[in-house]
Amino acid sequence: MNRRTVVTGGPILTMAEPGRVEAVALLDERILHVGSLEDCRAAAGRDAAEVDLGGRTLMPGFVDAHTHPLMLGQCAAWVDCAPPEVTTLDALVEKLGRRRDGLPPTAPVWGFGVHHGDLDVKRNPVAADLDRVATNRVVAVMHRSGHGVMVNSRCLADNGITRDTPDPAGGRIERDETGAPSGVLWDAAIDLITGPEGVKTLNHGPNIHIPDAPERLVELLCNAQTMLLRAGVTSVTDCQVTRREMETYLSARDEGRLALRVSMLTLSTLLEALVELGLRSRLGDDHLAFAGLKLYADGTLTGLTAYFESGYRFDPCHHGQLYHEPEELRRLIRRAHRFGLQTGTHAQGDSAIAIVLQAVREALDDVDRTDHRHRIEHCGMPAPEQVGEIAELGVIPVNQPTHHYLVGDALVEALGERAHRYNPYGEFVRAGIAPVLSSDTPVSGPDPLEAVWAAVTRTTRYGSVLGDEAQRITVEQALRGYTIEGARATRREHAVGSLEPGKLADLVVLSDDPLAVPVEDLRAVRVEETWVDGAPVDYARL
């Protein structure tokens, strides 16, 4: 193509050395040169187009190391059941009812975003509550964590869920005082409502794979892609890929609609299939690539299913839950490591994190790989001594700062004072661990600048602050966590995450310099343009 462009006229943050430059020269989809305007003009040639930033800030496109894009698109199409509009049970029922009134007579009503701590009743809705919306059709609301679904009586009946239905391995059917199902399904129990042809996660993770028509799933994925790109996110890791996601990504790519760069971690139910295929390392292209294996150790802090042998504040005998017996999880991680795969294991509670660290240690004793880059997804509540072990083993924690903004107050209620160590970024930095930040969208929104603000301030939705100054990180450290460190966590640092010659020209233009504005104004910094492959994104073709 020989498309040559020079971008200049505002602060340019490279996330590499030197940290700031005057200009960037692009050749087609790649960065040709960074440095002075004179040098970039010389590198690009006299016929190069020149783009004036007009004082705005240029930096690398954001890299979100933990997302669920198809789930984001699907949940965005459902009823938004989160604050500030929904803070009471009556408001939830009323809003779901409005959606019901606009649907065909038997179409299901789905919602997303409920958290018990946000409702006036301080509990999750149960079947009797959702029966107020409808009894002649399915009504279902996914918990904000993605690890639970609340359903009405019709959904329970349609799927044969009764008092005699046992809890599946890795899941739980909440029951009332008589033993009947209450209508709240956790983790692998969501398998029970995805139908005979739907994805089954078994005891390998929460079932976020709600069925829909294939062509509809492509549209939902493309809608999510637009949301991410408009937030300045150009590369993501999809942290739970099954055949549903794979088929949808392939369809979007084949239709020429995939602009986002996606690294896929396939769910551990597929480990033996990967071994049988011999798929031991990265496979794909610059926009869609297989990256490794996703596993689950425990549940979620927001759903009170994260695993702590010491229990929770409200009940020291309530420990949360594990998806696998410890030896089974360690075996899966050892097998994936021996085969050559990078793993990302969901672990929130310190007791679950201990199982993962032991598994990685055993795997390295078996086959020494110095650059394994095994990850712990979320890694919200490691014990203080585990931080050093994480550094020693070379494990990468992948955190989501917006989570402590959304649910930090509820965590203090559930865990007590130890919740102030949630997402211990300061401890990570002092141990030599570079923070990797992400959104886990749709659990939180896809806005990286809100996440940066949350990581720097540790402020919650209700205005309290988690931890002291020692747990905070700088704006620059947080920005690196959403660019070059996010790229490194998914083995893409050779291609994205910083402005360096030879890398892909994925750029974001911001209204202001995030390193110069007051910290309290970080969330107000706007993404004004997103570039992929050396040109502004053409949203009309997506």
Residue ranges and their predicted role:
Residues 205, 333-344, 348-374, 378-379, ...:
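His/Asp/Glu-enriched, well-ordered alpha-helical/loop segment
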Residues 68, 287-305, 395-404:
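Non-cysteine beta-strand/loop elements that form the S-adenosyl-L-methionine
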Residues 118, 158, 405-406, 517:
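Short glycine-rich, flexible loops that bind phosphorylated cofactors or substrates
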Residues 2-8, 13-276, 295, 300-335, ...:
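Divalent metal-binding segments
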Residues 527-542:
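Short peripheral tails and domain-boundary helices/loops at the edges of structured domains
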Residues 253-255, 279-288, 369, 390-392:
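Acidic (Asp/Glu)-rich catalytic clusters
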Residues 281-282, 517-522:
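Short proline/glycine-enriched turn/loop segments at secondary-structure junctions
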